[in-house]
């Protein structure tokens, strides 16, 4: 079986995971390449990158503005889809520049001794608001990358066939997603969620199912003896870390928060 998209970075010396960036592409590159002086580093954005709110040409211009800085620093940026991203930029028409790429769901990143599974998607708790906004429109088949503010196929998908294929060739030790298993923070249903659930009767159940997708992925990796040790995710705009009884470290990243995944010897 074909394991899907594999990203190899044999020349990288480091890995950094970023929380949501919400379209702040220039800020991310400046922060990594200039403010922190990163070099030879793979930077993985854990969703809510901001692809889809502008026309495709906008994102090409952003890349062209930043590619010189990325090249000089020998850094690469890999984006995973969040709920505030058009899935077409990841699964149907992925961006494939040398240093600037979008990762289809169930991609594997192989670098610095790690084999990293990337799975995107989440539910927008404010989806009812977005679908009633004047800027929202139903997607057109002949314009899959047209600008919009909501995408109904935002949810994550459990794909056992892809996991089976991955298991034949890889031993996953790290996973990067946008949201997280159901036992990870945040687990409260207050604030904006409670407000939005009043006008979206399916929201509570849909979010429950969304989190269970990652429960199933975790169960699959465990039952197939993958040496999972790290899980990174964003989505909740807060920072949190915990280690479970199996020794897996879960890392929730705040907006633009950066966390290093240490290279293996």
Predicted segments, located by residue:
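Active-site neighborhood of phospho(di)ester-bond hydrolases with catalytic His/Asp-centered motifs
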Residues: 17-19, 43-48, 76-84, 102-104, ...
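A short acidic (Asp/Glu
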Residues: 27-29, 54-57, 89-92, 129, ...
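Extreme N-terminal starter segment of soluble prokaryotic enzymes
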Residues: 11-16
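Core catalytic region of metal-dependent phosphoesterases/phosphodiesterases
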Residues: 18, 23-112, 207-210
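Glycine-rich phosphate-binding loop signature in dinucleotide/nucleotide-binding domains
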Residues: 35-39, 168-170, 225
């Amino acid at each position: 079986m074909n394991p899907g998209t594999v990203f190899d970075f044999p020349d990288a010396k480091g890995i950094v995971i970023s929380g949501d960036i919400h379209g702040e592409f220039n800020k991310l590159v400046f922060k990594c390449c200039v403010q922190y002086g990163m070099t030879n580093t793979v930077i993985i954005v854990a969703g809510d990158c901001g692809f889809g709110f502008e026309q495709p040409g906008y994102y090409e211009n952003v890349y062209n503005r930043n590619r010189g800085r990325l090249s000089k620093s020998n850094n690469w940026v890999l984006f995973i889809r969040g709920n505030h991203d058009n899935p077409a930029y990841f699964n149907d028409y992925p961006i494939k520049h040398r240093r600037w790429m979008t990762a289809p769901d169930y991609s594997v990143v192989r670098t610095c001794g790690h084999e990293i599974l990337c799975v995107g998607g989440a539910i927008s708790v404010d989806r009812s608001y977005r679908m009633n906004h004047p800027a929202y429109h139903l997607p057109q088949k002949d314009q899959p990358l047209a600008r919009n503010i909501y995408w109904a196929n935002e949810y994550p998908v459990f794909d056992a066939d892809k996991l089976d294929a991955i298991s034949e060739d890889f031993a996953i030790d790290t996973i990067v997603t946008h949201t997280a298993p159901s036992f990870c923070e945040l687990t409260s249903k207050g604030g904006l969620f409670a407000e939005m659930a009043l006008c979206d009767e399916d929201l509570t159940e849909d979010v429950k199912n969304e989190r269970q997708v990652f429960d199933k992925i975790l169960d699959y990796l465990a039952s197939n003896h993958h040496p999972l040790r790290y899980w990174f995710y964003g989505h909740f705009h807060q920072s949190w870390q915990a280690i479970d009884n199996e020794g897996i470290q879960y890392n929730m990243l705040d907006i633009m928060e950066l966390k290093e995944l240490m290279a293996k010897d």
